[in-house]
């Protein structure tokens, strides 16, 4: 097994967290759970007021907060959207979140927005472009961000840099951290036939400031081959739990978010899964001692 990475810089507490869902708010107020943090999607709060901000203010008084962006299109060719940058800055000033993150993906091209996180070509031009966009975002905020590794379903012949090396270069050149989505690693590994553990061992694990866990769906492509989809609509798969435990053996305890964006169960069902996260983190802490 590769040597354990040094611990990431302080940010979110190394505990279990949940993505906040407004339908759970009444239950949260009635009985606040023992969690380390909640994560919100930035674009849902880029309005001046209303119930969403009242709920977020309540959460911020009681929990650490992770702000996760989905729309900046850091991997795209278009300039970054000035309105989204301003919205991120306003959220940062208003709530002082413990972490701000975005994706290694694109969703805008030629002024048009696509409601998806699309893969990029891993080449020198893309590396320079993504570095420039990360630098611009970090300068806007005045702090480093975390960048999430993608789940992918296609590869490009034009790519000549391995994804793990691409992420290493981004961290080295921009000073950003990593949001390590373990489900994404597993999904991509199955779809492309690579070794997930070998991929993890090649990442700059000391830069990991947050981990994501989620469920995926199994489908078939036009040729009948199995394809995993990062769907966030099911419990975490056992294979992903195994990969998460392996990850913690490398990183030590890291703030870990349970994501659920479809087929959302009552809060109690999600808390049962976060209980398993807490147990894994405790084992990781024991290994680190």
Swiss-Prot record:
UniProt cross-references to InterPro entries, sorted A to Z: MbnB/TglH/ChrH, Xyl_isomerase-like_sf
Protein origin, superkingdom: Bacteria
TM segment ranges: none
Assigned protein family: Belongs to the UPF0276 family.
The protein's name: UPF0276 protein BP2925
Species in which this protein is naturally found: Bordetella pertussis (strain Tohama I / ATCC BAA-589 / NCTC 13251)
């Amino acid at each position: 097994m590769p040597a354990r990475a040094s611990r990431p810089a302080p940010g979110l507490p190394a505990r279990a967290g949940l993505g906040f869902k407004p339908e759970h708010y009444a239950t949260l107020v009635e009985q606040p759970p023992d969690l380390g943090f909640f994560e919100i999607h930035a674009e849902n709060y880029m309005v001046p007021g209303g119930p969403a901000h009242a709920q977020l203010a309540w959460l911020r008084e009681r929990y650490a907060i992770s702000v996760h962006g989905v729309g900046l299109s850091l991997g795209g060719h278009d300039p970054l959207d000035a309105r989204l940058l301003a919205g991120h800055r306003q959220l940062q000033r208003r709530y002082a979140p413990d972490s701000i993150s975005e994706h290694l993906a694109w969703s805008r091209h030629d002024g048009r927005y696509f409601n998806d996180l699309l893969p990029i070509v891993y080449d020198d031009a893309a590396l320079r472009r993504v570095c420039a966009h990360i630098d611009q975002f970090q300068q806007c905020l005045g702090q480093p961000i975390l960048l999430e590794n993608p789940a992918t379903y296609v590869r490009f012949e034009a790519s000549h840099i391995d994804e793990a090396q691409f992420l290493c270069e981004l961290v080295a050149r921009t000073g950003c951290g990593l949001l390590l989505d373990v489900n994404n690693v597993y999904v991509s590994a199955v779809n492309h036939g690579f070794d997930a553990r070998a991929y993890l061992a090649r990442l700059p694990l000391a830069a990991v400031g947050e981990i994501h866990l989620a469920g995926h769906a199994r489908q078939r492509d036009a040729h009948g081959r199995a394809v995993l989809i990062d769907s966030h609509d099911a419990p975490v798969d056992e294979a992903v739990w195994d990969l998460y435990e392996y990850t913690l053996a490398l990183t030590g305890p890291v703030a870990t978010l349970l994501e659920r964006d479809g087929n959302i169960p009552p809060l109690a069902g999600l808390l049962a899964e976060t209980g398993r996260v807490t147990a894994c983190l405790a084992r990781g802490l024991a290994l680190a001692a």
